[in-house]
Amino acid sequence: MGMEFGFRKKIVRSALALTAFGVVAAAEPLAFPEALGFGANVTGGRGGSVYHVTNLNDDGAGSFRDAVSQGNRIVVFDVGGIINIKTAVSIKSNITIAGQTAPGEGIAIHGGKLSTGKQSNIIIRYLRIRPGEKTASEKDDGLNLYDSKNVIVDHCSVELAPWNNFGGSSDNKDYRVTGITVQNSLIANPIGQQFGAHIESVDGTWAWYYNAFVNSHNRNPLDKINDVFVNNILYNFEAGYTTHTSTHFNHDIVNNYFVYGPAGKNEWFQMDKNQSIYASGNMIDKNRDGKLNGESSSIYYYQGVGEELSKPWNELTTTGPMLSAASAWRYVTSQSGVLPYDDIDSLVWYQVNTLGKAGALVKSVADMGLKTNNGWGVVLAGEAAKDSDKDGMPDYFENAMGYDVGKDDAMTKESYGYVRIEKYINWLGASHMQISDETSRDFDLRSITRGFQTVSPKYSVSAAENGTIELQNDGYTARFTPKTNFKGLASFKYTVKGNDNTEYTGRVEVLVEKSAVDTTVQDSTKRDSSITHITDSFRLRADAAVMIGVFDMNGHYLGLSTQNLPKGRYIVRQKIQGRDEYKVFVKK
């Protein structure tokens, strides 16, 4: 079955209670239309004020650190690039971090961890968090949610932490870790002890949806908590999902895909006694043959035998959207992590898409093999669109929506309970495009379905709101035409099907303007790094000890030359004395 995200008529649903894992009615809408799981009804900074991050400094006015030092804020970014921090950054309660507003290739936080310790009601979207080995503490996590509750993390890349990429532990019932969702995120390349995620809290709740755990020795995740683990993928792990504990917890482990990479050697699923487990539809691929052709997998018990449930312990598993394991692989490799990809994530996704041929467990940033910026790669800055009243919404969006570009009206409540700036950041956080009214605009559906490109995808379009949608003769271009005299938000649905019986259904959100499109803004196709990235030239070593190859983002070997390749992003791989070195190459 296909899965649909973000249908606006289905935005409001019941909230999840914090006790007895039940549900209660909610007057507020979801954190954002695609929000799922225990953290779905977090409100973040809704109703507070807007804070602009205006520089890449470690601290001071306009810095990210200052932005999250007080609660009741929606944080937007007027700059893109890398923020190097010297110490941990503490995020306060009642905050929305809208990383999708950053121009260019977005924002990356390097040099230290982010922490939500003892805080609550937080939304974090489109943020790259990469401490590296020179962080202030060798035991730093990337994102630490200790003693936190009611947090949702979406479309983030959490990598290169010396302890765990994700931390979320508590031994205190007064500050239990609960009401957490992590979705659509990339959790990769932990260094030091090389652990993916350590989650531990008695009576806590945690949901994982559509995430990728990549190049990680162990704890992918280690969940000593009541959890829902649905439609995630693991690649190149030595130990996968684990629950090594004597304390009783409930686990729903459904339709996940586990694929061995060069380091893979253990069963994916390690359970102990005293655990209650519902496991269904999970797949494992051990053959490293470059194809997604795994087999059904059952529970592997590490110490003792737990209770195997006949149905899910939590209703989220039965009521939420769900893909088959293979379709989840295709979706996650199409849209998870921070979009557009920067150099590090381009390398990680290339390794994933080789399906067993590439990838390594790394001990340092340099071990990844990137040859740009001392191994860190680059994150292109870009330029923010004009925002005359500094309310966080650019003028082009306010004009399209009929708002006042000379008045700070960001927190004015709109339909379905969202405030106006949430309308903007929710549009920007989805697959989206812009169009002038009464003018057709084409959208290349391949740009948001990369994971399906190896299985001869077939597309269909339907359910246009405030306009019409047609699939063009090439089979992948969707042409949207808005209604006459309409401006504001429109949308259409698309479905992609692979020849391996995989399928996904999603929506593209369309902003229809009254006048010509403001060229200073980037839509989801123009934000794609394969189009916007300008790379420096580089020289390949040419001696007998060096093996060179050019690969596309799906891991396919293309030869030794880029001369006849079409426009796009490629990986150049050099094997020098047994060590892989990489360069992200973009052909304009």
Regions found by a protein language model. Give the residues of each.
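Extracellular calcium-associated, cysteine-rich motifs in secreted modular proteins
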Residues: 370-432
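Surface-exposed or secretory-pathway low-complexity segments enriched in glycine-proline
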Residues: 440-481, 506
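C-terminal tail/sorting-segment detector
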Residues: 503, 507, 517-521, 569-588
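Extracellular beta-rich repeat passengers
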Residues: 222-370
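A short beta-strand micro-motif common to beta-rich folds, especially ectodomain repeats
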Residues: 486-500
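Extracellular beta-strand-rich solenoid/capping regions of secreted or surface-exposed proteins
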Residues: 65-71, 82-98, 105-125, 131-148
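Acidic Gly/Asp/Thr-rich repetitive segments characteristic of extracellular carbohydrate-active
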Residues: 30-75, 553-559
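Right-handed parallel beta-helix
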Residues: 94, 99, 120-131, 147-163, ...
